[in-house]
């Protein structure tokens, strides 16, 4: 009887899972205990920075600029999938677009001053660093869930998923350098390395950039008899894309390159030099692992939860609550501390819709996102 009670509780929990985690990761353990056929579709988008309004990222940054010491982060994610489920199996066609930009305070300050056409006190030193990585891909993913028994008070669900991906676009960039403000501008010395699948250069060998790869997802859920559960998900574990025929360039800018004229006098000129690879490159991209852990505890008609996401060394803590209106409907409310977004959601046994933003005025929001899921069982 106790075993049946835990299994029933697990199936009720999974039938209307709320994706409160900021990264909205896939958890293959959701499929454990499922029965029958079904179809589903989902779409998710997140635009987030922690130093400027997301919609103004390509603008002049204006009043929304609020940098901080250390790494200033910008993330763009869009995912869509549609597929079928059968018992504890799930097969889906997927689309992924993911970008991450990490820059230090000196670089974003330097960009801001130039966007705003602001003068800077002479002698100010900027040590700039930038890392950027992004890709787009489509493919297929197969998930499988497994049910295990821990003891009389708890069940364990496990899951694994494998994706086969075809890349459609990629870009990888690193930049570093130093700039010193002067009365008339800047003295600078900087280097950029950039591989962009959409770039074209003179004399480059013919070829069309293309990518292929795979991704491994793992998940686990522990469900206790009193209704509490711990959810763990790791996406893109031991995963990679191989990009063929990638253009590549390295550029160096120096404001004080030594030159001697015909009379032998020394003077300094600003120069911009670069080397474009004639032969296209093969680049192996290790997809960054993404993880999420969340603990839910029931309290009457409410569930209280706390958790955190993780990616590339960055943490995304969240706190929230879920209110059970009745057996078919739930609402959710959560807050993330990294981008300071408030998330609200509504959950039905057949669909989920949630949105988040760091401001009621989307144009001023440093982060905003939307998630929609529909699951229809064939009864």
Across the structure, where does each feature detected by a protein language model lie?
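Sec-dependent N-terminal signal peptides
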Residues: 4-14
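Sec/Tat signal peptide C-region and signal peptidase I cleavage site
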Residues: 14-20
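A subset of solvent-exposed loop/turn segments in beta-rich extracellular surface proteins, enriched
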Residues: 21-206, 251-269, 353-356, 361-378
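Transmembrane beta-strands of outer-membrane beta-barrel proteins
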Residues: 35-41, 87-93, 156-162, 216, ...
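Transmembrane beta-barrel architecture of outer-membrane proteins
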Residues: 76-78, 95, 136-140, 164-166, ...
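Structural signature of outer-membrane beta-barrel channels/translocons
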Residues: 83-89, 94-96, 145-151, 221-225, ...
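Membrane-embedded hairpin module used as a gating/binding unit in multi-pass transport
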Residues: 215-223, 230-243
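Outer membrane beta-barrel transmembrane domains
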Residues: 244-379
């Amino acid at each position: 009887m106790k075993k049946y009670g835990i299994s029933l509780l697990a199936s009720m929990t999974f039938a209307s899972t709320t994706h409160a985690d900021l990264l909205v990761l896939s958890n293959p353990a959701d499929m454990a205990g499922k029965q029958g056929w079904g179809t589903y579709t989902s779409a998710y988008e997140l635009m987030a920075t922690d130093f400027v309004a997301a919609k103004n990222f390509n603008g002049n940054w204006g009043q929304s600029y609020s940098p901080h010491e250390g790494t200033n982060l910008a993330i763009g994610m869009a995912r869509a999938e549609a597929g079928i489920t059968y018992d504890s199996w799930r097969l889906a066609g997927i689309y992924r677009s993911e970008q991450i930009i990490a820059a230090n305070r000196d670089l974003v300050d330097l960009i801001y001053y130039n966007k705003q056409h602001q003068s800077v006190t002479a002698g100010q030193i900027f040590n700039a660093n930038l890392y950027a990585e992004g890709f787009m891909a489509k493919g297929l993913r197969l998930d499988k869930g497994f049910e295990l028994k821990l003891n009389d008070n708890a069940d364990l669900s496990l899951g694994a998923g494998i994706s086969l991906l075809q890349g459609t676009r990629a870009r990888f960039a690193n930049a570093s350098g130093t700039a010193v403000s002067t009365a008339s501008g800047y003295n600078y010395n900087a280097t950029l390395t950039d591989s962009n699948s959409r770039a074209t250069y003179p004399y480059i060998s013919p070829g069309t950039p293309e990518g292929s790869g795979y991704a491994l997802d793992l998940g686990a859920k522990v469900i206790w008899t009193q209704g509490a559960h711990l959810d763990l998900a790791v996406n893109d574990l031991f995963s990679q894309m191989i990009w063929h025929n990638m253009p590549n360039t390295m550029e160096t800018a120096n404001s004080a390159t030594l030159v001697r004229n015909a009379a032998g006098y020394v003077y300094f000129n600003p120069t911009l030099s670069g080397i474009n690879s004639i032969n296209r490159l093969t680049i192996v991209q290790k997809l960054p692992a993404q993880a999420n852990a969340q603990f839910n505890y029931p309290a009457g008609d409410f569930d209280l939860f706390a958790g955190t996401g993780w990616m590339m060394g960055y943490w995304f803590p969240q706190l929230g609550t879920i209110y059970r209106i009745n057996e078919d409907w739930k609402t959710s409310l959560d807050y993330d501390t990294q981008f300071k977004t408030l998330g609200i959601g509504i959950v039905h046994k057949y669909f989920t819709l949630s949105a988040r933003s760091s401001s009621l005025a989307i144009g001023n929001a440093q982060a905003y996102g939307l998630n929609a899921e529909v699951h229809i069982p064939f009864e």
